[in-house]
């Protein structure tokens, strides 16, 4: 059984579990297939502030080497 990451479009929305790759990363293409227009991910820290997730080589990398049981939220480009 693979590992999954809980992602929601925004706070208060129902999260969707997205499959992680074998190396523990999440592909940008996997995220945008479920949430078109998404350009990034963010999550709330213990201090209740948002923190962005690192995107490198079209893969999101887990913060501090683990995704944990946190719900991550989509980041969309600002209006043009």
Where are the predicted features?
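Phospho-regulated scaffold assembly regions enriched in serine/threonine/proline and acidic residues
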Residues: 1-80
């Amino acid at each position: 059984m693979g590992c999954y990451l809980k992602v929601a479009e925004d706070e208060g929305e129902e999260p969707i579990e997205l499959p992680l790759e074998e190396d523990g990363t999440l592909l940008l293409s996997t995220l945008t297939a479920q949430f078109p227009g998404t350009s990034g991910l963010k999550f709330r820290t213990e201090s209740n502030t948002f923190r962005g997730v690192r995107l490198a080589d079209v893969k999101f990398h887990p913060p501090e080497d683990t995704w944990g049981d946190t719900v991550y939220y989509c980041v969309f480009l600002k209006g043009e």
